[in-house]
Amino acid sequence: MRSVIKVLELKNASDVVTIKKAISNKTGVLAIQINIEKREINVVYDDYLLTVNDMVDCIEDLGYSIL
């Protein structure tokens, strides 16, 4: 499954590293690509192991707001 998550506070390389590290550690994540300009996270994942809500919760736990 592929999902696009929009993050309000995604502004710099440090944000990319923080979010990428947290999401990549989730079981079921196959690929992740982050676009700072669009404030988007594109995630390919196994929807039997993980839901988009699991990833949203993870990002929000880091202090970011989801659009």
Ranges and model annotations:
Residues 39-44:
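A generic structural motif
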Residues 1-9:
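Short glycine-/aliphatic-rich beta-strand segments at the starts of folded cytosolic domains
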Residues 46-50:
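Helix N-cap motif at beta-to-alpha junctions
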Residues 18-22, 54-61:
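Short amphipathic alpha-helices in soluble, non-transmembrane regions
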Residues 23-35:
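Short acidic amphipathic segments
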Residues 11-25:
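Short amphipathic alpha-helix segments
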